[in-house]
Amino acid sequence: MRGKFIVIEGLEGAGKSNAQRIVSETLAAHGIEFITTREPGGTPIAEALRNLWKEGEDGEHTTDKAEVLMIYAARIQLVETVIEPALASGKWVVGDRHNMSSQAYQGGGRGLAELVDEVGSAILGDFEPDFTIYLDIEPSIGLERARGRGALDRIEQLDIDFFHRTRERYVSLVKDNPKAVLINAEPAIEQVSADIQQAVEIFLTSEK
């Protein structure tokens, strides 16, 4: 039986790493074999593209449109070499970000929705997650949490309006996606973790 693809989405500081851990622990408790991935990244080539996108080269950074293409190049490399083979073998995949990130960040934040839709459709076709957990958080709260982890990266240093646009797009996407659920990521981590586990349990029940 083909595995299922569960994706964690959200702004910086929303708690995606914790969510991926909770989802993984819940699947393990049910005896489900799975792997975890992250985007951009997850393969040597995809990780190299991630580093190039985040760090640039000799002071040069990607333009907004080049960013879209680079992220989708990393994404399809991961899908074709890691995610699809795992799903085909019956393993589940728990991903830290997928296509909704591009729709929200590059489509909403960068204002390149049309390009993102065109590239995403051409690259991914009808491939999509079976279940998406979106962790919703007010941008200023998320960025404050991110600062607590250390220096902000190039994306995290963008103006707050960028993240408001990104969040607005996320909420719209989740509202229109019956395979996605919104979880308030602002309460204490114990509450958020419990909400995530409950969402996964409900999904597992629906798949029986």
Curated annotation (Swiss-Prot):
Keyword check for Manganese: no
User: GO molecular function, one example?
Assistant: dTMP kinase activity
State the CDD domains in the record: TMPK
Task: Tell me which UniProt keywords the record has, alphabetically.
Answer: ATP-binding, Kinase, Nucleotide biosynthesis, Nucleotide-binding, Transferase
GO biological process terms on file: dTDP biosynthetic process; dTTP biosynthetic process; dUDP biosynthetic process
This entry's Enzyme Commission designation comes to 2.7.4.9
Q: Name one GO cellular component term.
A: cytosol
User: InterPro entries recorded for this chain?
Assistant: P-loop_NTPase (IPR027417), Thymidylate_kin-like_dom (IPR039430), Thymidylate_kin_CS (IPR018095), Thymidylate_kinase (IPR018094)
Reaction(s) the record says it catalyses: dTMP + ATP = dTDP + ADP
Positions bound to ATP: G10, L11, E12, G13, A14, G15, K16, S17
Classification via HAMAP family: Thymidylate_kinase
Q: What is the recorded function of this protein according to its Swiss-Prot or TrEMBL entry?
A: Phosphorylation of dTMP to form dTDP in both de novo and salvage pathways of dTTP synthesis.
Q: What is this protein called?
A: Thymidylate kinase
Q: Name the source organism.
A: Glaesserella parasuis serovar 5 (strain SH0165)
